[in-house]
């Protein structure tokens, strides 16, 4: 008889625990999935529950903003990036920097440029790697505000040091 009443109360307990961010007895947070609750259909604002159990209001996007973003994606960025195999062999990074194709303040683009150095290093073209890494180090250093690029610069310095060992 007790089992029957437990079965009837279980769905109520789940619903109660689901809505209050219930923590399991052994300390793990209940991982139930919650759907966003719409606040404003016009702007798309919704309330979502974070993994910590706290609620957060996620900012929406108007139709006009979405259209502008979509237009920028297809006209300026020209859609998704398609990279051919071996494209680094066909490109001279110094020429592309001079033409303004890379924005040094953008981390992703700096990583792409550092990739040229990595490629030369692993192809054992140490002299070329040394020259390019030294150039990039001088180019990147002015953008190192509050040591945010410390790791990137250390990586270039390490490659310069290793290349000097092979070249000299």
UniProtKB/Swiss-Prot annotation:
Record key words, sorted: Cytoplasm
Subcellular location(s) per record: Cytoplasm
Region called Disordered, residue ranges: 1-36
Gene Ontology CC entries for this record: cytoplasm
Positions with biased composition (Basic and acidic residues): 1-15
Protein's name in the database: Uncharacterized protein YPL108W
Source species: Saccharomyces cerevisiae (strain ATCC 204508 / S288c) (Baker's yeast)
